Amino acid sequence: MLLSISIAILIGILWSQVISHWGASILLHRYYCHRQFRVPVWFETIGLAMLMVACIRTPIGWIASHRMHHEHSDHEGDPHAVSQVGYWRVLFTTWNIEKIPMKYARDLFKNPRLVFCHHHWGKILIAVNVVSFLISPYFWIAYAAVPFVFAKIGFGLLNTIGHRTEGGANVPW
């Protein structure tokens, strides 16, 4: 049993890397936030499906908050600046934005795939967890639980370690 859990965790770590690189780094960050290139619909759809597993909540919220971050990097208005919301809330990704100004998300609401995920992320997350657990608790560990933990802590580490100096590095979106 311990070997099965260990293998599930190892597979979950590898799966987390796929989600992190394809879904978060390429799709959310470079494609949506910075509009650096175009991707085919299949690439976008698979990437969004991966992100729903990692519980980033709504992709529109993630993208808009990241755009806010770039406009106000490490200063007032940055939704995940340690100086504004506290080290532990940033580290464990428990910060919250009361209201995101529409200027950061207006273009995103033109994308039906993003809008679908925005409206249904909670139901998708519950379904992913229930179905994967019913398949097997080990499958759930690898497919859903480990990526969830890695996403929460990974984004938190990126935002605490990557912005520990005054001003941080900022590239306009």
Set out the residue ranges of the language-model regions.
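Non-catalytic, topology-defining segments of multipass membrane proteins
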Residues: 1-157
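Active-site-proximal inter-transmembrane loops
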Residues: 111, 165-173
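Hydrophobic alpha-helical segments that either span membranes
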Residues: 160-161
